[in-house]
């Protein structure tokens, strides 16, 4: 390829990327290939590069370029590349989620009748198409794949006696946060499928109550079709739109989730003629039988005039998905806040239809109505990695000759690719010299009155930061530690930005949190984190190694925590269940860290965002409290509280703080109480997909605790492994933490004492009973856990000289425990 052609290739690629930047999200990888064409093509304003310019990506033994005349439709459909043997495209990509879109238009070219072609398409880990034949005029297949290597290979395999073809290909990065978490399984509420590695095929993407949304009006180049063709009994529904009222609340749905055009329109019940009528609005969609499907519902209450006015139910295939949905409450008491809900369902055997319905709440009937704004239905790969039924097996081919041709072609193609990519790299470095490290900008700020934009000495390295009082680290050293922010080292995404695993020059592992300019967290949180963590050192607080603000970056470097968050070990990640002893020790460690924050200085420090995701575990599962971006210095000695705007995480937020905007250390105690029940029950603290009485974990757990039947809702993996007196003490501690008023809650010191005691009760040998007697375990108890034996409940506490009566502990729980605490708990922990 000549230099002039290569420069044209770079220019066109840059223009395509800039078009996406203008829309919002910036894809790292952005391949748009006009297959079989000697010239570039366009689709909805986006430029698809000529197949000639991108031919180095292709490994194929034969070159057959097909074309057809005509001016109808986009020119990318007028050419195609034909494969008579196994052929593949190899794309160099960053790891993470990508769109893969394949365009097909079956025209006739010489002896090739595209409508009769039969073939398979596969990636390294998924079969995308099998025994595929294009029967309609134009077909677009869209997939969402999580690429875990540095290359994505798309292989086209003709069926025996046939051929394969493709008109155009897209491979585009999408935000890793777009498909995350563990959606609830409709019909099996205890099941939470892990979506992180799922391959998905888009089956339907619908704009409810609104017009067609073309790809050039979507930040992620998606197309949304109107819902009219899927709607049953159209007279029961009506459409409305109100685009200006849509609110994108930080922490919830964004314009990358769905465009404003989708959230600003909806289909609702047509109940104006009879407001007392109760019925459902239903849509029906075609699906392939035998697969599980991922449903993403988009909601925005643009119909209500006030908060808490709209309550409705959601159904998938006649099964209840969610009841009494109150959108304004789900989005931080915001009217018209954009919100999405995810579900998974299994289609019935032999059924190729799925129905979705909305209907009014049967509890809140003042304003009977129901709405939905958008819906995405995606097919999930089966256990074999297949997204298509058929006989194709990856790695097979029609003949040994095809295999030999593929091997030889791959070898030659790989050699040429190395030369090509080497040339690209040299020219790219020349063009970009002097611009390395540039990022989107923030306004600089200062700490202690001095600018954070000063120059760094050339000798400063990450390994010397422990002796550098100001904790600053040069950007070059951060890049070196993370291999230039290699996406393969990305270990998570939080409210502040991405987190990378790094390694210092001495081999010490670190976690590098790089701020995202689009994040709802910014300068204030960055500064608070530095100020707080540079003051404190405690074995149960995550240590700050340093920070970097060079080139207007906002980067925080912490000690690396090998086992991640407590939340990830409770639900949604598929990790092994924690034992009861491990959970107690984790809670004790976190309580020690919070107790130190509250008492370790002349003025307490209130964390303000205590939750399971902010408690990290090292290689020995020792807990450390993390994420101090929202922390606040507590009140002076002569004050009872700090008046401040409400911040925190929904589900963990102290209701008294929320009502009065008065922050105290007891707000942390409330949040920690929620964590205690989360650790015990192993479920999300807020789950809107559950029945209304179960949505809020704190309320649900307290209901069962007051009935004396908390053991009925604990994590199933704990049954038969908890002593009833240990559970009782743990539950009573959590109950006291969740008192309505802060004055009625214990201090963190008292919480810590009680948790230590719960651990001792679990480990102690009950007098007169062998230690391995299973009748002491919760799994053997009747429902009323408070009715266990009321005999001698005193225990010998290992490592102490005296005996402690359980009743005496109960009597002391509401008062200061400082004297007793000092005898049982060492300041450095265990």
From Swiss-Prot:
Induction: By brassinosteroids (BR). It comes from the Eukaryota. Its EC number is 2.7.11.-. One of its GO terms (molecular function) is protein serine/threonine kinase activity. Keywords: ATP-binding, Cell membrane, Glycoprotein, Kinase, Membrane, Nucleotide-binding, Phosphoprotein, Receptor, Serine/threonine-protein kinase, Signal, Transferase, Transmembrane, Transmembrane helix. Pfam families: Malectin_like, PK_Tyr_Ser-Thr. The chain crosses the membrane at residues 406-426. GO terms for cellular component: plasma membrane; plasmodesma. Receptor-like protein kinase required for cell elongation during vegetative growth, mostly in a brassinosteroid-(BR-) independent manner. This is Receptor-like protein kinase HERK 1.
């Amino acid at each position: 390829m000549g230099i002039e052609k290569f420069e044209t290739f770079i220019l066109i690629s840059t223009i395509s990327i800039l078009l996406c930047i203008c829309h919002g999200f910036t894809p790292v990888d952005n391949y748009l290939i006009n297959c079989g064409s000697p010239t570039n093509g366009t689709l909805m304003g986006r430029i698809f590069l000529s197949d000639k310019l991108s031919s180095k990506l292709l490994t194929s033994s034969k070159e057959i370029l097909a074309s057809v005349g005509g001016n109808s439709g986009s020119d990318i459909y007028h050419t195609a590349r034909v494969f008579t043997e196994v052929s593949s495209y190899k794309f160099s990509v960053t790891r993470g989620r990508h769109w893969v879109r394949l365009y097909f238009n079956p025209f006739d070219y010489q002896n090739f009748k595209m409508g009769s072609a039969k073939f398979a398409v596969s990636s390294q880990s998924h079969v995308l198409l099998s025994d595929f034949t294009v029967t309609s005029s134009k077909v677009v297949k869209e997939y969402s794949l999580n690429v875990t290597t540095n290359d994505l290979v798309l292989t086209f395999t003709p069926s025996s006696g046939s051929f394969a073809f493709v008109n155009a290909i897209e491979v585009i990065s999408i935000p890793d946060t777009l498909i995350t978490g563990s959606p609830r399984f409709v019909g099996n509420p205890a099941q939470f499928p892990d979506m992180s590695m799922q391959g998905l095929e888009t089956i339907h993407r619908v704009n409810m109550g609104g017009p067609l949304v073309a790809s050039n009006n979507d930040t992620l180049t998606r197309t949304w079709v109107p819902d009219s063709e899927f709607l049953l009994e159209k007279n029961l529904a009506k459409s409305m739109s109100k685009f200006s009222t849509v609110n994108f609340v930080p922490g919830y749905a964004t314009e990358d989730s769905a465009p404003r055009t989708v959230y600003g329109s909806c289909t609702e019940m047509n109940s104006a003629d009879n407001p007392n009528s109760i019925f459902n609005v239903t849509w029906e969609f075609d699906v392939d039988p035998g697969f599980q499907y991922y449903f993403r519902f988009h909601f925005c209450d643009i119909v209500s005039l006030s908060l808490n006015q709209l309550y409705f139910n959601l159904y998938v295939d006649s099964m209840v998905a969610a009841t009494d949905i109150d959108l304004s409450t789900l989005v931080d008491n915001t009217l018209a806040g954009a919100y999405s809900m995810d579900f998974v369902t299994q289609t019935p055997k032999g059924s190729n239809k799925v129905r979705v319905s909305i209907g009014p709440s049967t509890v809140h009937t003042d304003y009977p109505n129901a709405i939905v704004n958008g819906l995405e239905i995606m097919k999930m790969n089966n256990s074999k990695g297949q997204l298509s039924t058929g006989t194709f097996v990856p790695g097979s081919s029609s003949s040994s000759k095809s295999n030999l041709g593929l091997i030889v072609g791959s070898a030659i193609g790989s050699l040429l690719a190395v030369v090509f990519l080497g040339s690209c790299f040299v020219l790219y470095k020349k063009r970009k010299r002097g611009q390395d490290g540039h990022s989107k900008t923030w306004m600089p700020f200062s700490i202690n009155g001095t600018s954070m934009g000063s120059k760094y000495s050339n000798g400063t390295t990450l390994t010397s930061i422990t002796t550098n009082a100001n904790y600053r680290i040069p950007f070059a050293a951060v890049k070196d530690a993370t291999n230039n922010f290699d996406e393969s080292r990305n270990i998570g995404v939080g409210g502040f930005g991405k987190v990378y695993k790094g390694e210092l020059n001495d081999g010490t592992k670190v976690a590098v949190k790089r701020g995202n300019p689009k994040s709802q967290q910014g300068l204030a949180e960055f500064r608070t984190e530095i100020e707080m963590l540079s003051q404190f050192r405690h074995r149960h607080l995550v240590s700050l190694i340093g920070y970097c603000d060079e080139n207007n970056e906002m980067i925080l470097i912490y000690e690396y925590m090998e086992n991640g968050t407590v939340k990830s070990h409770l639900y949604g990640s598929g990790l092994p269940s924690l034992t009861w002893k491990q959970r107690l020790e984790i809670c004790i460690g976190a309580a020690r860290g919070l107790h130190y924050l509250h008492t370790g200085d002349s003025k307490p420090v209130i964390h303000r965002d205590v939750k399971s995701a902010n408690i990290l575990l090292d290689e020995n599962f020792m807990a450390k409290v993390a994420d101090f971006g929202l922390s606040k210095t507590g009140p002076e000695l002569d004050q009872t509280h700090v008046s401040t705007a409400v911040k925190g995480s929904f589900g963990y937020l102290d209701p008294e703080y929320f009502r009065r905007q008065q922050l105290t250390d007891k707000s942390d105690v409330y949040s920690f109480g929620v964590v205690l029940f989360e650790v015990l029950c192993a479920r999300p603290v807020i789950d809107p997909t559950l029945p209304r009485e179960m949505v809020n974990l704190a309320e649900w757990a307290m209901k069962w605790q007051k009935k004396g039947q908390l053991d009925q809702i604990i994590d199933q993996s704990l049954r038969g492994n908890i002593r009833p007196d240990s559970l009782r003490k743990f539950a009573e501690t959590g109950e006291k933490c969740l008192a309505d008023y802060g004055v009625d809650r214990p201090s963190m010191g008292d919480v810590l004492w009680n948790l230590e005691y719960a651990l001792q009760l679990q480990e102690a040998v009950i007098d007169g009973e062998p230690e391995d007697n299973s009748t002491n375990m919760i799994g053997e108890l009747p429902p009323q856990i408070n009715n266990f034996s009321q005999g001698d409940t005193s225990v010998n506490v290992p490592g102490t000289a005296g005996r402690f009566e359980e009743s005496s502990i109960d009597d002391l729980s509401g008062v200061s425990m400082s004297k007793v605490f000092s005898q049982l708990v060492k300041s450095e922990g265990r």
